[in-house]
């Protein structure tokens, strides 16, 4: 059944999948349902799910309490384009949970969150360049997709196209403090450094001892905002994410679908001192 569905999909969906990471030979397994830690494929095989939405489905598939809440909300409507009490409650909860968080902007996707976090940093600092680490994945938009550790975007012509769009993106090796120190000597117009506290898209690469502390110190000394991309690490390393686990206080943090156990939900969090930029940029 999965093989047949893949052949049908290739006729209408580029590559037969809606994300390059879902494509593998000879064909991907198509899923019909999931419950708890297991999924059932369209081939009627029950499998233990080690992926769990790339970590977003923290509580398991079809978690009863969340499903019940969703069903209740569906009867009340789904899109108002107006504020709700629930978003205020979520912002308040995140401010209590995430270190160094005084303001929160709620969104729907991880890419949207990191994009707005970078825009916030550029607005607040009035600088235009960003620093990311080789292999770090921060979303599917051009500014950060270069050297993202995904095979689908690592070869020409995609890299050639991204190069022009990402000309203000500076890429250095992860865990390489010397490279960062040399970079800030050369470039005085760096708005922010964005980092996955634990590099996930090219394998789980743990930061060397004192690495995160040092990049916090270097960014502070050079007027560069530090962004923790916690799309993967948020609520997993600890309830307060990598920021709490490592004891580092970034200026801005981003969180993804783990906020909603896999539902489209994301957030940007940070300090209240950037309030004017919060309002004008995101």
Q: What is the predicted function of each stretch?
A:
Residues 1-282:
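Conserved N-terminal phosphate-binding loop of PLP-dependent enzymes in the Aspartate aminotransferase
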């Amino acid at each position: 059944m999965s093989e047949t569905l893949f052949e049908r999909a290739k006729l209408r969906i580029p590559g037969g999948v809606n994300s390059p990471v879902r494509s593998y030979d000879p064909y991907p397994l198509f899923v019909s349902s999931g419950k708890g830690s297991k999924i059932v494929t369209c081939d009627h095989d029950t499998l233990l799910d080690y992926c769990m939405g790339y970590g977003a489905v923290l509580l398991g598939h079809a978690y009863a309490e969340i499903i019940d809440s969703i069903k209740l909300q569906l009867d009340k409507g789904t899109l108002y384009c107006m504020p709700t009490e629930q978003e205020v409650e979520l912002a308040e909860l995140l401010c209590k949970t995430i270190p160094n968080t005084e303001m929160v902007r709620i969104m729907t996707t991880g890419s949207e969150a990191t994009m707005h976090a970078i825009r916030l940093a550029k607005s607040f600092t009035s600088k235009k360049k960003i620093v990311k680490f080789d292999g770090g994945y921060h979303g599917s938009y051009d500014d950060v997709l270069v050297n993202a550790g995904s095979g689908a975007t690592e070869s020409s012509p995609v890299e050639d196209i991204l190069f022009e769009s990402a000309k203000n993106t500076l890429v250095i090796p992860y865990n390489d403090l010397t490279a960062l120190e040399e970079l800030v000597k050369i470039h005085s117009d760096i708005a922010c450094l964005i980092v996955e506290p634990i590099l996930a898209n090219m394998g789980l690469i743990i930061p060397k001892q004192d690495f995160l502390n040092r990049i916090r110190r270097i960014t502070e000394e050079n007027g560069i905002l530090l962004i923790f991309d916690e799309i993967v690490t948020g609520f997993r390393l600890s309830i307060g994410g990598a920021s709490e686990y490592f004891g580092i206080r970034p200026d801005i943090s981003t969180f993804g679908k783990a906020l909603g156990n896999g539902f489209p939900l994301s957030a940007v969090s940070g300090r209240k001192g950037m309030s004017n930029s919060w309002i004008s940029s995101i």
